């Protein structure tokens, strides 16, 4: 059934006064009818909207599109997109991603896309194949859809996105001020969700590739309640979480019927999964068992018998348009040169066989061919002994003979049990050749001996002044492996709320935050989660917090010591899947007055636990002038929920309270800078035994980050950063905790956890030489801001962040108009004296040189120098939101030596 556009009423601004009268009001175009519309429920209005279509029939059609072996997996289609989004939100290079070799046989399989655009799809058929795509090296996600060869892409897309949704349906869009009907359509070809297209109005569009998650039902309840929408609409409400301008945003919709709602969810999730599948299909994949190469082009014939042989030929323009569709950022000059090599009969058009040759030419990487020839003495096969020689001399691998043999056999061809060029390339791209040394650490040490991935102002999505508070900040942080989050609690009209006090930020319910934490606390890592509570609530609302946390967290909340008579903190292993509260505690009477002056302006989170005695003296002056306020009273019921992170106001490192194993000090960066070098040795000594947290100062209104290396070198366990800002500081933080899967914990070096040692005692400062050959790039993704006529012109910048105040920088030349396979062949040499290579970082940035001379960074990768492996390595790139750029990599040769 087609979904016709319904004439929507004029939008009416729904202020707080309107919302207070009715949980939900559909606005009327008549000013005189406003009072009547306040009593009109959304359900009644929704009944007037047309039915989107027959979802059951669409599902049956979709089943027909699947091969028999995949029909069992169809039931997971609705969950698959969210699972993939969750996986892709983590920036760690997982083993599964490396199982996809960046070859180009998929071009052959997707010729039908171009033919469809040319109107020649009558006889062309496509046959796609299953791809393993797992969250880690051991477990696969639900298998991606396999499409039967009797159906083409047009049929599949029409099934995923019904015609009614393609043409546009009336949905209600909910914003802060308005509720209005919008014509919403989904274009399966471009992948854009569009609002009010072809209605004569300015329209908004959103690419499904930018969708991070789709929330519905109870998972979106907090948004529905925030906008005061009746619970009767819960089943038809869905929230699209997407990324735009490097920020998380939310789009809220209500479908007219439950069937329409379900069809929209399936269309959005199905198209997102399909597009990811399209990007993967046809690549030279590595099988999950044995990780052997499969060349699908030998097994598939998507062309079959065409009615007209001439329609099976492509000219240079066709190939260029196809490469643009498939994000192959190659210049016209490069494509023309390759095209001419493949055009054997010089006809100016490619047959299918010639196109296969064209693809093989694109796939050929001369730099790997040269390496292969060097270690095989020109042979077309690499023997076991030659492979062993390559690993030991080039890659500096320390593997025993049996391990090398097992690795070699797993990559050998089934035909002759020998490693050819394709298998060798597969190895270079596999997790077995990762550029980063895997983290294998003891998790049985006390908590104070670990660095803990920590977030500051977790609830904010943007700036500290006037920004938006959202549970998305908590969800995204937890999905990325954060293990210490912050909640600023304030009195709300109907219970505690979370916001950044006195800064005009929005508010969210405390209970909604707790619900989100409960759901996502351990989805990535089972190790304990710290919740830093900053309390600004009255005693009654504090008790409400206690009650709800006990109810929501249950046994996962640690409310008493794990064992009796403890003298040291428990280990992460002792606290698997446990939640620890960090709460300000005091031995002084609860009714005392504070010496805090009333501060005007931006609230510095945690200030009540960080000020030194020097600051206290200045505040006493304020008291004499009559500027005083009642200290926040932390009720005993709440203090008792923090057996291992009792936050104390810092007075002196020598006091008895500073030597209790369960206390924690919190300092702003401003406080540490103010005390300077005098504080450094005492703080470092304190952090050998006890917990400490450092967070950004209040003047960072843009939510920027400091360099966390400064505080890691002092042994600070919880260096809290603004995770909403993916700047250099956060990239360095992510690099330190990089792991697959992420744990959120990293054991400190011995000098920072063993009493009696000092920094550098494991080894004197040494001079190192780091040589990196920047060889080439692979399938660099086109930056969104580029115009359709502009081709990527990349260059590489390398930075070394060590103890120097300014990082070392080196830049390559610009490769103009080639983002598909740029070749640099340049060498960076870095020499320096290093005593703390545990915290020293190397950072790779890929820039685009614009036609107007403006440069922009579109990809990055950061890694600790001491964990950077030597030899030929592919580094997997991230975009500037910290998301994986699938199949985009830099090919390097790395050498480290002491001099």
UniProtKB/Swiss-Prot annotation:
Domain annotation EF-hand: ranges: 330-365
Residue numbers of Phosphoserine PTMs: 83
CDD domains in the cross-refs: C2_PLC_like, EFh_ScPlc1p_like, PH_PLC_fungal, PI-PLC1c_yeast
Keyword Transferase set for record: no
Lipid metabolism among keywords: yes
MF (Gene Ontology): calcium ion binding; phosphatidylinositol-4,5-bisphosphate phospholipase C activity
Active site, per annotation: 456, 500
SMART domains noted in UniProt: C2, EFh, PLCXc, PLCYc
Annotated Ca(2+) binding sites: 343, 345, 347, 349, 354
Recorded GO CC terms: cytoplasm; cytosol; nucleus
EC number(s) recorded for this UniProt protein: 3.1.4.11
Reactions it catalyzes: a 1,2-diacyl-sn-glycero-3-phospho-(1D-myo-inositol-4,5-bisphosphate) + H2O = 1D-myo-inositol 1,4,5-trisphosphate + a 1,2-diacyl-sn-glycerol + H(+)
PI-PLC X-box domain boundaries: 441-584
Disulphide bonds in the chain: none
Annotated GO biological process: inositol phosphate biosynthetic process; lipid catabolic process; phosphatidylinositol-mediated signaling
InterPro entries associated with the record: C2_dom, C2_domain_sf, EF-hand-dom_pair, EF_Hand_1_Ca_BS, EF_hand_dom, PH-like_dom_sf, PI-PLC_fam, PLC-like_Pdiesterase_TIM-brl
Domain C2: 750-879
Binding of substrate, residues: 582, 584, 666, 693
Alphabetized UniProt keyword annotations: Calcium, Hydrolase, Lipid degradation, Lipid metabolism, Metal-binding, Phosphoprotein, Transducer
Pfam families, per the entry: C2, EF-hand_7, PI-PLC-X, PI-PLC-Y
Function statement: The production of the second messenger molecules diacylglycerol (DAG) and inositol 1,4,5-trisphosphate (IP3) is mediated by activated phosphatidylinositol-specific phospholipase C enzymes.
Protein name (Swiss-Prot/TrEMBL): 1-phosphatidylinositol 4,5-bisphosphate phosphodiesterase 1
Species of origin: Schizosaccharomyces pombe (strain 972 / ATCC 24843) (Fission yeast)
């Amino acid at each position: 059934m087609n979904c016709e556009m319904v004439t929507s009423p004029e939008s009416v601004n729904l202020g707080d006064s309107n919302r207070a009268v009715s949980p939900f009001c559909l606005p009327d175009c008549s000013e005189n009818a406003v009072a009547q519309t306040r009593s009109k429920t959304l359900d009644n209005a929704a009944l007037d909207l047309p039915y989107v279509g027959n979802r059951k029939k669409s599902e049956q059609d979709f089943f027909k599109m699947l091969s028999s072996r995949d029909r069992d997996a169809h039931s997971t289609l609705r969950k698959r997109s969210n699972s993939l989004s969750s996986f892709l939100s983590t920036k760690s290079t997982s083993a599964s991603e490396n199982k996809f070799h960046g070859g180009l046989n998929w071009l052959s399989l997707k010729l039908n896309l171009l033919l469809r655009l040319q109107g020649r799809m009558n006889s062309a058929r496509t046959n796609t194949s299953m791809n393993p795509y797992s969250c880690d090296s051991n477990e696969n996600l639900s298998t991606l859809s396999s499409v039967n060869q009797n159906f083409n892409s047009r049929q599949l897309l029409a099934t995923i996105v019904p015609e009614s949704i393609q043409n546009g349906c009336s949905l209600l869009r909910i914003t802060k001020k308005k509720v209005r009907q919008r014509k919403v359509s989904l274009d399966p070809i471009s992948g854009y969700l569009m609002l009010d297209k072809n209605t004569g109005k300015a329209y908004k569009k959103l690419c499904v590739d930018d969708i991070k998650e789709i929330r519905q039902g109870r998972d979106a309840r907090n948004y529905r309640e925030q906008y005061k929408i009746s619970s009767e609409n819960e089943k038809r409400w869905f929230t699209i979480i997407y990324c735009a301008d490097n920020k998380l945003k939310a789009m809220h919709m209500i479908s007219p019927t439950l069937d329409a709602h379900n069809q929209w969810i399936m269309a959005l999730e199905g198209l997102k999964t399909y597009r990811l599948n399209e990007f993967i299909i046809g690549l030279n994949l590595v099988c999950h068992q044995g990780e052997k190469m499969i060349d699908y082009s030998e097994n598939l014939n998507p062309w079959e018998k065409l009615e007209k042989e001439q329609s099976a030929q492509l000219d240079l323009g066709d190939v260029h348009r196809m490469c643009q569709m498939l994000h192959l950022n190659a210049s016209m000059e490069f494509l023309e040169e390759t095209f001419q090599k493949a055009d054997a009969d010089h006809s100016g058009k490619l047959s299918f066989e010639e196109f296969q040759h064209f693809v093989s030419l694109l796939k050929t990487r001369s730099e790997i061919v040269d390496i292969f020839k060097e270690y095989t003495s020109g042979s077309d096969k690499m023997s076991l002994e030659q492979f062993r020689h390559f690993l030991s001399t080039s890659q500096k691998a320390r593997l025993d003979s049996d391990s090398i043999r097992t690795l070699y056999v797993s990559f050998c061809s089934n035909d002759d049990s020998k490693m050819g060029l394709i298998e060798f390339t597969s190895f270079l791209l596999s997790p077995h050749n990762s550029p980063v040394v895997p983290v294998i650490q003891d998790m049985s040490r006390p908590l104070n001996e670990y660095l803990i991935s920590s977030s500051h102002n977790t609830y904010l999505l943007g700036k500290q002044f006037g920004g938006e508070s959202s549970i998305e900040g908590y969800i995204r942080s937890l999905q990325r492996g954060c293990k210490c989050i912050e909640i600023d609690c304030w009195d709300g009209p109907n219970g505690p709320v979370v916001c950044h006090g006195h800064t005009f930020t929005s508010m969210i319910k405390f209970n909604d935050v707790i619900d989100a934490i409960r759901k996502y606390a351990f989805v990535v890592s089972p190790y304990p989660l710290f919740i830093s509570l900053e309390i600004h609530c009255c005693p009654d609302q504090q008790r409400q917090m206690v009650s709800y946390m006990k109810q929501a967290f249950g046994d996962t909340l640690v409310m008493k010591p794990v064992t009796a008579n403890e003298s040291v903190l428990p280990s992460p292993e002792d606290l698997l899947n446990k939640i620890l509260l960090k709460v300000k505690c005091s031995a002084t009477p609860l009714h005392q007055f504070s010496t805090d002056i009333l501060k005007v302006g931006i609230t510095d989170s945690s200030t009540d636990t960080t000020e030194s005695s020097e600051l206290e003296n200045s505040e006493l002056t304020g008291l004499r002038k009559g500027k005083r306020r009642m200290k926040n009273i932390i009720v005993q019921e709440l203090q008792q929920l923090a057996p291992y992170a009792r936050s104390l106001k810092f007075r002196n490192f020598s006091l008895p309270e500073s030597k209790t194993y369960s206390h924690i000090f919190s300092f702003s960066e401003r406080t540490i800078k103010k005390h300077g070098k005098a504080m450094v040795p005492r703080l470092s000594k304190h952090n050998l035994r006890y917990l400490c947290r450092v967070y950004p100062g209040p003047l960072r209104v843009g939510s920027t980050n400091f360099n966390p290396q400064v505080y890691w070198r002092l042994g600070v366990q919880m260096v809290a950063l603004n995770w909403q800002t993916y700047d250099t500081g956060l990239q360095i933080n992510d690099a330190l905790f990089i792991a697959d899967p992420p744990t959120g914990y990293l054991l400190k070096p011995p000098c920072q956890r063993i009493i009696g040692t000092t920094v550098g005692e494991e080894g004197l400062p040494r001079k190192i030489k780091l040589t990196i050959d920047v060889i080439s790039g692979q399938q660099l993704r086109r930056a969104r801001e580029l115009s359709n006529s502009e081709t990527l012109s990349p260059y590489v910048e390398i930075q070394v962040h060590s103890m120097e105040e300014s990082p070392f920088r080196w830049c390559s030349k610009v490769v103009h108009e080639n983002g598909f396979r740029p070749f640099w062949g340049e060498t960076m040499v870095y020499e320096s004296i290093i005593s703390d290579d545990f915290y020293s970082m190397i950072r790779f940035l890929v820039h685009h040189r614009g036609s107007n001379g403006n440069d922009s960074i579109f990809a990055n990768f950061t890694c600790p120098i001491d964990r950077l492996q030597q030899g030929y390595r592919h580094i997997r790139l991230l975009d500037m939101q910290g998301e994986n750029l699938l199949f985009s990599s830099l090919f390097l040769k790395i050498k480290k030596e002491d001099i």
